Amino acid sequence: MMTHKLLLAALMGSVCISCGHPPHKGGSEKEALGKLLFHDTSLSEPSGQSCATCHAVSRGFADEQSRAISEGAVQGLFSQRNSMSVCYAAFVPELHYDDEDESYVGGLFWDGRSPSLQDQAGVPLLNPVEMGNKDKQMVAEKVRRTPYYDRLIRIYGETGNADSLFAYVTDALAAYQSSKEINPFTSKYDA
């Protein structure tokens, strides 16, 4: 029964994409900004780690490491789990109990703790092992120093508030994770 639900979700997603209705509103400007953020190694502490470090394009946006855990931005510190692929994460439902299957379904991360792409996008940025930033203010300061900060302001508007800027960052990351680049539906079964 679970397989049927997953197939239905994939089919519905491909219908949405083919009709020109992406799963995330925002269009190509936000997606392009999100891609820059996703690949920016200056957003970690210390710098050198990006979202793409653990979600490698060459591995289907999954962890390049084939072991159960991966090293984060700080040398010698390891995450609790290997990074899962972000492909098709835009179509994962919020965590809920399915009475018919008598099991929990959905949610992002291995344990389903995150209800949305925007929420999920912020977790690694503030995780002391993954990207090592202490707080949203630290992330905001780094984003303000990037060459694409002007583009972010054009899309979202100016803000001096770290919480708002962090929300803009996670929204752009969610837009990129909802893009056709990450959700291509190119399998022969997607036709």
Where are the language model's segments positioned?
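N-terminal secretory signal peptides that target proteins for export/translocation
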Residues: M1-T3
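Periplasmic c-type cytochrome electron-transfer domains
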Residues: C19-A191
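Sec-dependent N-terminal signal peptides
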Residues: K5-S14
